[in-house]
Swiss-Prot record:
Protein name: Small ribosomal subunit protein uS11c
GO molecular function terms noted in the UniProt entry: rRNA binding; structural constituent of ribosome
GO biological process: translation
Classification of source organism: Eukaryota, Viridiplantae, Streptophyta, Embryophyta, Tracheophyta
UniProt KW Nucleotidyltransferase keyword: no
rRNA-binding found in the keyword field: yes
Any Pfam family hit: Ribosomal_S11
């Protein structure tokens, strides 16, 4: 029988591997994707390489609680805490989606002490593209 391959790194919240703490980042981009079911916060450098990320699900919220504003605030705080330790001082914020966590995540980002150069809404809006699904009848 073959030997199992040992896992290298830290397994926390379903993620395997340690974060790269070697890079010093002064400016970055914070992407907030807020759906009705979850909120995902991704922090990248200006070239688009992911530095840190978090979501309401990885913060321990399950089911309907993932879509709440408090869960979005917690996810944003978790993602930003690591990049503040790496020296990030300025950021641009891109917010996508119609979820409840939009404002709460932005509030958590503002409270973190990072200077925001701009906040942009990048929610995709169709110019009358695909036909939407039929209305629910309850």
């Amino acid at each position: 029988m073959t030997k199992p391959i040992p896992r290298i790194g830290l397994r926390r919240n379903g993620r395997i591997g340690l974060r790269k703490n070697g890079r010093r980042i002064s400016k970055g981009v914070i992407h907030v994707q807020a759906s009705f079911n979850n909120t995902i916060v991704t922090v990248t450098d200006v070239r688009g390489r992911v530095v840190s990320w978090s979501s309401a699900g990885t913060c321990g919220f399950r089911g309907a609680r993932r879509g709440t504003p408090f869960a979005a605030q917690t996810a944003a705080g978790n993602a930003i805490r690591t990049v503040v330790d790496q020296g990030m001082q300025r950021a641009e914020v891109m917010i996508k989606g119609p979820g409840l966590g939009r404002d709460a995540a932005l509030r958590a980002i503002r409270r973190s002490g990072i200077l925001l150069s701009f906040v942009r809404d990048v929610t995709p809006m169709p110019h009358n593209g695909c036909r939407p699904p039929k209305k629910r009848r309850v």
